[in-house]
Amino acid sequence: MVNMIDTGNTAWVLLCTALVFFMTPCLALFYGGMARSKNVLGTIMQSFFLIGVISVEFILIGYTLIFGDDLHGIIGDFSKFGLGGAETTILSDTHIPELAFIAFQCMFAVITPAIMSGSVTGRMRFAPFVVFALLWSIFIYNPMAHWIWGGGFLSDLGALDFAGGLAIHVLSGVSGLTLCMLLGRRRGYGRMPMLPHHLPMTILGAAILWFGWFGFNAGSALGVGFLAANAVLTTQISAAVGIVGWVLVEMIHRGKPTVLGAASGGVSGLVAITPAAGFVTPMAAIIIGFIGAIVCYLAVAIIKNRLGYDDSLDAFGIHGVGGTWGAIATGLWATTTINPDGANGLFYGGSLLGPQLLSLVIAYLFAVVGTFILFKIVSAFMDMRVSIGSESLGIDISEHGEGAYNQSEFKSSGRFISSNQTSLL
């Protein structure tokens, strides 16, 4: 059996697994820097704690629900419950141990609900968020991932998603938007400044996210070769032009280039190329990343303000909108010259755009309806939102009993006392 393993492909997938794992704590830094100082630890904790919870969920039932034998195109069966039989299985197409594939996919499952947390920063209690994220992963992410990657009905319709533009970014972004609207806006939103408290932390998080994204996209080739190389290059190009596109529009609109804008533009470009990285040419990636940054900027800087919803850290504005554009762009620029197992987009004489648009409609509907139902179920048993006093004090102290900065003393009750605990930031 050992002789059947492609050691090069296996090493590549294991390396990319480590890179993708690194993305979740870096997402925590990216979000943490954008949060107010009284909420930074709570924001980081919402992402970091999910590494533990969702990893266990995925190993026990998530993997089999996604990649188990298909049941009517809807969900996988329980044939792989608890990874049954995977210990000695080698995937026939890539000749890697199934355990390596499981580890890689586990990192995707972990980061998806963590992205969603950016929509509710500063106002959702920790325990209900964890319960909601766990249920969301089981009943929303797992079915959607099966529909796309596990032999479900969307893949049968011909929809393509190379590394998670639909299953990860659109799903988490739209669910985040739904969740933030159900929770309501932060108190004082629109009336007092709610500025990022630590932009160096955000730019560091964005930079390391970029590094990890090479594993995210190129690792989805599940082996070394032309496809992985193309994914690395398209990822780099799209992120690079994303920075340029966002900052240019920002200068036109607001008159000054910002560090936050550069970080947001880079991430927008990364999100936009995610579904397309293994299907489009590097030249197409330039267009995809540039337009992706522009549409994300419009969503974050203009549409959100006009509609008045409080997507705290723009999970929908960047991931939902960027993923939507990326899925459409795949339907336009995908070519079998890059990936013979893919399909030709509209600009190459193919009919891929139709399945891509249909899959987007289904993803949006499923995310909105599913998130609404799960929110109502969890809120029937738990208070989802922090109290007025706790929100004013900050979730770091009220939910976790600690503060990120200027710690001075703890009372016997364990409540943290800090000189800056009433800061607006």
Please place each PLM-identified region on the residue numbering.
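Glycine- and aromatic-enriched membrane alpha-helices
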Residues: M1-L425
